[in-house]
Amino acid sequence: MTALRLIVGLGNPGPEHAQTRHNAGFRFVDALIERSGARWALDSKLFGETAKVEVAGQPVWLLKPATFMNLSGKSITAALRFWKIEPEHLLVAHDELDLAPGTARLKFDGGHGGQNGLRDTIRLLGHGKFHRLRVGIGHPGHKDRVVPWVLGRAGREDDAAIGAAVDAAIDVLPLAMEGNFNEAMKRLHTEKK
């Protein structure tokens, strides 16, 4: 299996978006930064904030696109080119409407599932052959309420559940860093009792 070299968190920049459901990907990479003690640095040529951290003794780049969600692919493809990283070494963390808060799932390849940051990334790469971390934010129940839902803040209970899902994903990240995605998926996808 392929080890990770770049982890991207998807979200929208700016304080008005900081705590929204749509920024679950930012929340994941911010938690990695917090645990590592590293700091974000703005990199205009990569259209985002970057940091280099170690996970399980291995170096990995982190990226938070400073573009809005719909243009995330611009930042991601610039980083892949600049650091000469193939997409199969990429993990993109993003919010997932189709998973309940408190749920996180790893997957490789596939479509965008309506997630605009993934849509733009797949469009610019020409394929979806990269790893994803899907962080559940739940669904509002009707498609007409999706936009205000993702751009809104989660209630206390859902917010705590999203935080727990982020923590669970970080706990299995060392396995993914080593390229052992099957074991990472097995552990992350197994319900805790």
From Swiss-Prot:
Q: Would I find RNA-binding among this entry's keywords?
A: yes
Q: What is one cellular component GO term in this UniProt entry?
A: cytoplasm
InterPro entries, alphabetized: Pept_tRNA_hydro, Pept_tRNA_hydro_CS, Pept_tRNA_hydro_sf
Q: Which domain of life is it from?
A: Bacteria
The cross-references to Gene3D superfamilies, in alphabetical order and at most eight, read:
Peptidyl-tRNA hydrolase (3.40.50.1470)
A molecular function annotated in GO for this UniProt entry is:
tRNA binding
Q: Which HAMAP family match?
A: Pept_tRNA_hydro_bact
> Per its UniProt entry, what is the enzyme's top EC class, as one word?
hydrolase
> Site positions for Discriminates between blocked and unblocked aminoacyl-tRNA, renumbered to this chain?
12
* Disulphide linkage map: none
Name assigned to this protein: Peptidyl-tRNA hydrolase
Catalytic activity, as annotated: an N-acyl-L-alpha-aminoacyl-tRNA + H2O = an N-acyl-L-amino acid + a tRNA + H(+)
Keyword terms, alphabetized:
Cytoplasm, Hydrolase, RNA-binding, tRNA-binding
Q: Where in or outside the cell is it found?
A: Cytoplasm
How this chain assembles, per its entry, is: Monomer.
Q: Which residues bind tRNA?
A: 17, 68, 70, 116
Gene that encodes it: pth
The EC number(s) attached to this protein equal 3.1.1.29
Keyword Nuclease assigned: no
Q: Major place of localization? A: cytoplasm
Q: Where is this site: Stabilizes the basic form of H active site to accept a proton?
A: 95
Described by its record, this protein's role is as follows:
Hydrolyzes ribosome-free peptidyl-tRNAs (with 1 or more amino acids incorporated), which drop off the ribosome during protein synthesis, or as a result of ribosome stalling. Catalyzes the release of premature peptidyl moieties from peptidyl-tRNA molecules trapped in stalled 50S ribosomal subunits, and thus maintains levels of free tRNAs and 50S ribosomes.
Catalytic residues at 22
| Family from the record | Belongs to the PTH family.
Q: Which GO terms describe its biological process?
A: protein quality control for misfolded or incompletely synthesized proteins; rescue of stalled ribosome
The family database entries (Pfam families) matched by this protein are listed as: Pept_tRNA_hydro
